[in-house]
Amino acid sequence: MIVEQINDGNFQEKVMEHSKNTPVLVDFWAEWCGPCKQIGPVLEEISDEMKDQVIIAKHNIDQEPNTPTKYGIKGIPTMLLFKGGELKATKVGATTKSNIISWIKENI
């Protein structure tokens, strides 16, 4: 499964609405962020492995700054997990694949 790119304009539909049926993990990132580049491929793997359990989406904070501001994103990478149309959990910083999977499973 491909990681979906989202923006301020489609955040409501792609994240809030979809999370009512399937949890959505949003990775807030930027091109210049080294740790963001490290977890990008990891999130793609997780997207494939957990495609029936969670949708993985990416939001570029430099190109689309309104949504990160709304959710108080101060450092990246930051991952927000939405379920049932609401923010369920937050994880800040790069970490291992197994830690991300455990975090997802704990919160879905």
Question: Which stretches of residues belong to each language-model region?
Answer:
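N-proximal helix/coil linker or "cap" segments that precede and/or mark the start of modular domains
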Residues: 1-3
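Short pre-active-site segment immediately N-terminal to redox-active cysteine/selenocysteine motifs
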Residues: 22, 29-32, 75
